[in-house]
Amino acid sequence: MASAAPLAGQIAVVAGATRGAGRGIARALGEAGATVYCTGRSIRGRLSPYGRPETIDETAEMIARAGGTAIAVRVDHTVESEVESFFGRIAGAHGRLDVLVNSIAGEEPMMAQWSSFWKTNLKHGDAVLRQALLSHIITAKHAAPLMLRRRRGLIVEITESDILSAGGNPLTQSVKLALKGLALNMAAELKPHGVAAVAVTPGFLRSEAMLERKGVQEANWRDAGKKDKNFLESESPVFVGRAIAALAQDARVLERTGQLYGSWELAREYGFTDADGRRPDWGSADIDFSQYPSSFLEYFRTTSEIQLEFLSALTKRTKRFLSQLPRASSKTVKKKARRTAGG
């Protein structure tokens, strides 16, 4: 019989647990029995500068009301000294870290997703790169040593899609691609140390902001499907959270390192459902493309075709280069891993 709290005793950090996917992930990890640290910048009395009311305090309280254990800690993940201090606190209190989820967003008002690159307002360029990308690197940098010492752990990068991103804004698209690449690069370095790194994307996410945009609440979200059929295949933030919880429970998760998964794919494999008992599957949804401007669809097609040609050429070159590399002996690899882990 499966344990009611399979992650009991594990320590998890969800960076960006204020709202959206991050909040759902924190809730699902708490539901599975982990002690969850909910970090972010928005706390009571010090809300988001972008007008959002959610706080990490609320997220921690949701977990506690459901019978879980959660601690809200205000951390600005763009400030390395704050991040270093926070993980020092984790080390002192627990001496371990089992799961890190990087769900820090770049804040949509700054991202301006669909503007053409020659029209991009770069006023917030530095802030976007620091908040949406560098924060992830800073956080992983200071979390990893807690996993390396125990030769186990899971780092998850939350991304927006399971395909190559398209859209003109160079800030937005560079960040989206970089987060996928970050998981891949970390996986290569961490695998010899027993630590897994993956990227996971939700499907059509019913975040707080999306519900507001559709003019509905979680209790009546299906009403929005009358205008947008695609929304009927949407998922609550808890669904992607349960995907992360399933990975964290998997004793063979290291075999998955370096991969990109959709929440729906992991649901098929692990058998979990959304909070309402459904199993949404955005990957096989019959998408109604009439909801999107034809100019955008054509641009997306052109961009994707160019990207695939680029990747095909890059794959051939990389394979040719790899065929010329001498293979290191297993002893050499193990020695290097020990040296790296020891600093």
Task: Name the predicted role of every residue range.
Residues 140-141, 184:
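A short, exposed helix-loop element centered on a Lys and neighboring polar residues
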Residues 199, 218-311, 336:
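C-terminal helical subdomain
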Residues 10, 68-69, 96-97, 147-161, ...:
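Active-site loop of short-chain dehydrogenase/reductase
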Residues 61-79:
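Rossmann-fold cofactor-recognition segment
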Residues 106-110, 116-124, 128, 154-192, ...:
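Catalytic loop of short-chain dehydrogenase/reductase
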Residues 34-58:
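Conserved glycine-rich Rossmann-like NAD(P)H-binding loop of the short-chain dehydrogenase/reductase
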